[in-house]
Structure formats: C-alpha cells, structure tokens
Amino acid sequence: MAFLQSAYLVMVFTVPIAGVILNTYVLRKLIRVARKSVVRFETTSGLPLAAMSVGDSITLCALLMQAIFHITPKGEVPTVVLSSICKFGIFLIHSTSAFSVWCWFFLSVLRYIAVFHPFKYRTIWRQPRNALKFLAGAVGMFQIYTLIFVTYRQEEKSCGEYDVFHESAFKHVHLLDIFLFYAIPSLLRITLDFLVLIHCYSPFSVEGLDRVTIDRRYAISGPATTKRFSHTGETDTLDNKAHVALAISITASTNTPSVKRIHHGNPKKKTAMVMRSILISVLNLLLNLPSHIFRAWASYDESSLENEIVRTLEPIAQMMYFSQFACNAFYLATSIYETNGSPRNTVISSSNRHVSRCISDDEA
C-alpha cells in the first residue's frame, strides 16, 4: 500500500511534466505544418491532433497545479481563495479531459470517412474546425456545474463538493458527465474503429486483397502534394515544388466504374498505421475505465470505498488515469502521418462517377 502511494505521488509530478514536454514537441511540429498550409492543416488530422494536444497540456498543468496545491501549507489563506483555486482547477481538468475524449472520437470519424467515403474525405473544408468549436463550447457549458459544486473542505484539507450537492439528487450529474463524456464517445469510437478494422486489416498479403480495400487503406493518409477546394473556389497548394494537375471528369451515364490507380508507398505500412492508431485508442479507453468506475461508485455509496481492497485498488486506478496522458502524448508524437505522406496518382470512382487526380512526379 505504501509503495502504491509513493508511486502515485511520483506520477502526479512526473507525468504532467513529461506530458507537457511531449505535447510541446507535437505542437511545434504541427505549427510548422500549419505555416506551410493552413488548408492542409485544417482539412486533415492536423487540427484535431493539435486540439487534443492543447487540451491534454491544459489538463496536465491543472493536475500539477492541484498536486502542488494539496501539499502546500495553507496558513492564513482565506477560504474563498482556496475554494476558487479548487473550482478553477477541477473545471479545467474536467473540461479539457472531456474535450480530449471527444477529440479521439473525432479522429475515429476521420478514419471512417477516409475508408468508406474517400471522395468526401478529400473535399473536407470547414467541417473539422466548426465541429471542434462546437465541441469545445458544449463541453465548457456542461462542466460549469463543477464551479457550483466544488469547494475547499476544511475538514479534509482538500477539494470536494458541498454536502448539500453530494447528498442530494444533484449527484446524478456525475453519472450524466460520465455517460456523455466517456461512455457515449467510447462506444462510438469502438464501433467506428471496428468497422475500419474489419474493412482495412487482413492477415494475408497485399497481393491477395481486392483493389478497393487497398485503395481505402491509402485514404487513411493524406498526400503531401494535393489541392483542396473550398466551396468558394479557393485553392491551396500543399507543395509548391511539385507540379500538380488535377483533372476531374464526371460521367453520369457510366454503370461500370473505370479505375486506374498508380500508388506510391507501402500498403502494409499504412495498414500497420491504422492498426497502431486503433490499438492506442483502445488502450486509452481501458486506462480511463477504472477511474470512471470508482467515480460512479462514489456517487452512490462512498462509504464502501473505505474497504481495504478498494483503498488498495484506487491508487492503481488513479495511476492508470494519469498514464492515459502519456498514451495520448505517444499517439500524438508518432501518428502525425498525414503530414508526411508521399505523392501519388489516384482515381476514385463510384458506380456513376469518375474522379481522376493526376500528379506530376518530376520533382518528387
């Protein structure tokens, strides 16, 4: 038990610092991408990855702030100041961690669209930015309840809730919080990632796969040289050194699709990339689960948490919760694959539509 407590205290201070360092590295890399092309940054996974990185950094800083707050002598500090620190810290932790969970779901949505609707994926424009704005606003509005519930409890010398809220029906808000910001996005992520997995992953060699499956694998990673079009006709060139010619032909009367594809890259590598992203996503869910179970348990029967076995397991659950941020940072640091794609010639076709993208490789 003492060992677990010591390990927990070490993680409280080391994980936030390490996580902020990793996220700073990720943000610097993404900023370089954004400077080269804002459109490329906003219409690929760059924007949600950056949003997740910022959210995780704020969460880690808030966790570190709370850890320092609890070991710092309070002296004659007014209770109203201590309560304000508690409110602000808990609000930041809840809001940014909930936002991060939905960002994971957002990445799963992008994977799903890339696999099952590759043409739509190539024509994404303002949707990611607008979705993240709405998500941030909705999460912030919901988590306002923490500013009302949380206070500094003199008896325990720690942050907690007012008794009037903890002992009333208001405690059900915690269950709603868990349901909206863990259960729902987690189930949706599992569903979408499972569909992508069964469509894109095969234990057999690439030669044995049908061409459509292989091409859908390629849709996961954005090219380094392409053009994206806005609804107003604006274009953005992602690589000024490459000569890009985009030819779009639409034949409404074609019943048999005409497909011509020349690929650059390794399909197995792209499949492994998808698998890695999904596995890290599942690991993140598992690391979150014990903490949410204890939180839901405490909402209904806090006295049972005094059991010796439960008191032993709770630090482990907390350590798993802190570990998720290292998991997030690892994902962010290793999965910015859309910023490093290689040029490719692609034709995307459906039953009555033929779209051709031709890329000159003179300087590739």
Swiss-Prot record:
It holds the Pfam family 7tm_1. It is a multi-pass membrane protein. It comes from Caenorhabditis elegans. Not known. Putative receptor. Residues 23-48, 111-130, 199-277, 337-364 are cytoplasmic. Residues 1, 70-89, 152-177, 299-315 are extracellular. This is Probable G-protein coupled receptor AH9.4. Keywords: Cell membrane, G-protein coupled receptor, Membrane, Receptor, Transducer, Transmembrane, Transmembrane helix.
